[in-house]
Amino acid sequence: MSQSQTDSKAEQKRLNPLTDEELMLEFQNGSNGAFTLLMRRYKDQVVNYAYRFLGNYDDAVDVGQEVFVRVYKYKNNFGHTIKFTTWLYTITANLSKTELKRYWRRNSVSLEQSGNPDSDDHAWDIPDNDYLPDERADQSEIAKRVQIALMKVSPTNRELIVLRDLQDCSYEQIAEITSLELGTVKSRINRGRKQLQEHLRDIYNDYFQIFTKQDDGK
């Protein structure tokens, strides 16, 4: 083993026990190994957030890559008064919303025709053939249908549901990420959950009707 490999392993061993915030301080002080470790810790979570919000895996991967480009480029913008994950998800949420607007521009749908993307009542339906990539085709039917239903929830409420129920962020952290009042966060999450339940009910009613017809031989 070369000296550089030995040094690299020693550096990794030193960094592994550190918190996210401690790793950011190391990164700000010149440790690229700290950045690599942060990326390993959160790459999948960032892509998962973007996928759940956008409904398209390829776009989610692109967002994930850009998130860590921003983390690298703007590392000195991170202040140690907040959690690293709050800063990270703020970047992820903003880039995901930007990508959603790009999606509609690519599909020749103006924001004026589509309605206000920040409206609680406006749900943007991504085509169903985009909701699951080929490499994830082995996911359960339930997981697929939950994602379809999630994409029918209005973007503002969907963002909060993903942060709370899928990314396990606290209400206080979500308020920081979205710059919303705590009471607004809680009410929108409740509203979004109700929307999700309604869409799941609609999907499963159709699903069971199909199988009833098949069982009847029709």
Regions found by a protein language model. Give the residues of each.
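C-terminal edge and immediately downstream basic/flexible tail or linker adjoining helix-turn-helix-like DNA-binding
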Residues: 1-6, 108-112, 124, 145-148, ...
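Helix-turn-helix DNA-binding module
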Residues: 18, 147-184
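Amphipathic, Lys/Arg- and hydrophobic-enriched alpha-helical face
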Residues: 39-57, 74, 150, 202
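Arg/Lys-rich amphipathic alpha helix in sigma70-family domain 2
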Residues: 76-80, 90-111, 191
